[in-house]
């Protein structure tokens, strides 16, 4: 997350929401009902971690809203009603998801304006081109996206539900076969760090 005109993002953090596994464990620590991003990572031993984005598509809107709230108020420290917002989406994102993103931005955060762009198109723009093919492999999904004059060609986009999280799963399987135990979401994050 960041601001137009900056050379780099102001904030980079994982799209994770963590909730206490047991109530009362964090007494005296100003326990919150949910932790987001790096704070969730740092307390992962006593939290259950959830990923609101699966295979590049938002699957839990309440948690996604928490991530956006954290982005505006904790990371960027801005009032969202004072800034237009550029959101990115995965190629072939369902129209209903785009509508839900728009609804939350306007109705919950009162943004004055917003635009939703496909991640691969912005990657191509960053390289100074408007036509090309982008291979985008993230945590949950990989895409090859042909782009012509700034427009993704939906009929030619290829999607593969194989990405970083699958590599983590495979590494976890190999380590489990060697006698290591992974039962909590926190232990899964340790494997992710090893990867």
Swiss-Prot record:
It catalyses: ATP + H2O = ADP + phosphate + H(+). GO terms for molecular function: ATP binding; hydrolase activity. Its EC number is 3.6.4.-. One of its GO terms (cellular component) is cytoplasm. Keywords: ATP-binding, Cytoplasm, Cytoskeleton, Hydrolase, Nucleotide-binding. Belongs to the actin family. This is Actin-85C. It comes from Solanum tuberosum (Potato). The gene is AC85C.
